[in-house]
Regions:
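Generic beta-strand structural signal
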Residues: 71-74, 94-96, 110-112, 119-127, ...
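Short catalytic-site patches enriched in acidic/histidine residues
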Residues: 96-114, 135-136, 177-184, 244-248
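A generic local secondary-structure boundary/capping motif
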Residues: 63-65, 86-88, 112-121, 127, ...
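Structural signature of FAD isoalloxazine-binding scaffolds in flavoprotein oxidoreductases
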Residues: 91-108, 123, 258-269
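N-terminal non-catalytic cap/leader segment that marks the start of a structured domain
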Residues: 1-95, 264
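Catalytic-pocket segment enriched in acidic/His residues
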Residues: 5, 9-10, 48, 55-58, ...
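Short, structured patches in soluble enzyme cores that scaffold and shape functional sites
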Residues: 100-102, 109, 116, 123-127, ...
């Protein structure tokens, strides 16, 4: 299933794409796509429902984030060896873990803010994992039992704040609008091979990133198992899994976003985002 949220910010309705590509209002079955409802039981009920009988939502309305109010937004850094190389970093022997503030989450086509004085705003197309039930101290072979689905993420990063301001990466990763997710939460049964999905990102119509999830250093099962050793994961938690090469920081000379720039990104079977950078 492809689940999404449609409507003005703060008033989104949960929906699902039916077999004809129409968006059906599922609010009679689930109040919202939040941690209270993002679980395997809810998905099972929706899969058995007669979607064609549900009201249709307008495809021209704003698409919100595919999840609202997740408990955690966990991120994995330098998870593609060629991306690590372009940043001058060593290939990690274990997953590099950091957090993004959940308040940074916005819809897939919402504006991305650039604040006064920001000089190194960067892009990162990434695969997001959505957890479907409590996950604690599990093996890699158990990981798929805990994964509800996947989504497209743009891990927007202000590199000066991330690297030059001292401390952890979270400062450069967490400003409002630095976490566009969606358009869809795609349940895992719709993905034939999560470890072989094409991904790309364009800035102002120019291709910047081209990659495939097959080149991740740590695949989704490893990541979920690894994180579960250090923190419990709950239904609705998002894990974004790292980016392929082609970020602005890795270019020579470096290139960063400015007000008026546009980003278009996609991952195979997970949909597409279109964002504009606006001055705050």
């Amino acid at each position: 299933m492809k689940l999404l949220r449609v409507g003005n910010k703060g008033n989104e309705k949960p929906g699902v794409l039916d077999k004809d590509g129409k968006i059906r209002d599922i609010s009679s079955h689930v109040k919202d796509l939040n941690p209270d409802h993002l679980n395997f039981e809810t998905i099972s009920k929706l899969q058995s429902a007669d979607l064609s009988s549900l009201p249709e939502l307008s495809a021209s309305d704003r698409i919100g984030s595919c999840i609202t109010k997740p408990g955690k937004f966990v991120a994995i850094g330098l998870n593609y060896s060629d991306h690590a190389a372009e940043t001058g970093a060593d290939v990690p022997s274990e997953p590099i873990v950091f957090m993004k503030a959940t308040s940074c989450i916005v819809g897939p086509n919402d504006d991305v803010e650039i604040v006064s004085g920001s000089k190194k705003l960067d892009w990162e197309v990434e695969l997001g994992i959505i957890i479907g039930k409590e996950t604690k101290h599990i093996s890699e072979s158990q990981a798929q039992d805990h994964i509800l689905g996947y989504c497209l993420v743009n891990d927007i990063s202000e590199r000066e704040w991330q690297i030059e301001k001292m401390g952890q990466w979270v400062k450069g990763k967490s400003h409002d609008t630095y976490g566009p997710i969606g358009p869809y939460l795609v349940t895992k049964d719709e993905i034939a091979d999560i470890n072989n999905l094409k991904m790309n990102l364009d800035v102002n119509g120019k291709r910047m990133q081209t990659g495939n999830t097959s080149t991740m250093i740590f695949n989704v099962d490893i990541i979920v198992s690894y994180l579960s050793k250090f923190m419990s994961l709950q239904a609705g938690d998002i894990i974004t899994t790292g980016t392929p090469p082609g970020v602005g920081m890795g270019m020579k000379p470096q290139q960063f976003l400015k007000a008026g720039d546009t980003m278009k990104l996609s991952i195979e079977n997970l949909g597409e985002q279109n964002s504009k950078v606006v001055a705050l």
